[in-house]
Amino acid sequence: MERYCSILLEWNRAIRLVGPKDAAGIREQIVDSLLPYLLMKPSFPLLDIGSGAGLPAIPIAILNPKADIVCLEPRAKRTSFLRHAVRALGLSAVSIVEGRASALDPPEGLIGKFSTVTARAVSEIETLLALARPCLAPGGGGDPGPRW
């Protein structure tokens, strides 16, 4: 987790990924992103909508290195960060998809595939649920995550 914190801190200087600018603040963000995971123990495959800095997807992947996790992020700079972090951390089971979740047209290959969907600060809960629903496999669930 410390390696991820270092990578995030380094990239955060160039492209704003998270609010905190120091390691302690980033560690707090990482721990905060894991709280729902620790309470609910998601099943896999997992889709993280609007992955941004990789929270909670990358910390979950660090704890479950063989878990099938897909990070969906629309912004190119952030997908570059995610690809770098995943490579640097050796998280070979994590995939990065550059694209938007859309209730009208989810990205190809994401429909009906996931047992769990996570997101942080993506949209209002109703909108987020509409985005997540098409991606969930029958019987799948999700963690909408806290909004700050």
Language-model region placement:
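Class I SAM-dependent transferase core
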Residues: 1-47, 77-94
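S-adenosylmethionine
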Residues: 57, 66-70, 74-148
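Aromatic pocket-lining residues of Rossmann-like dinucleotide-binding sites
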Residues: 60
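Class I SAM-dependent methyltransferase "Motif I" SAM/SAH-binding loop
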Residues: 50-53
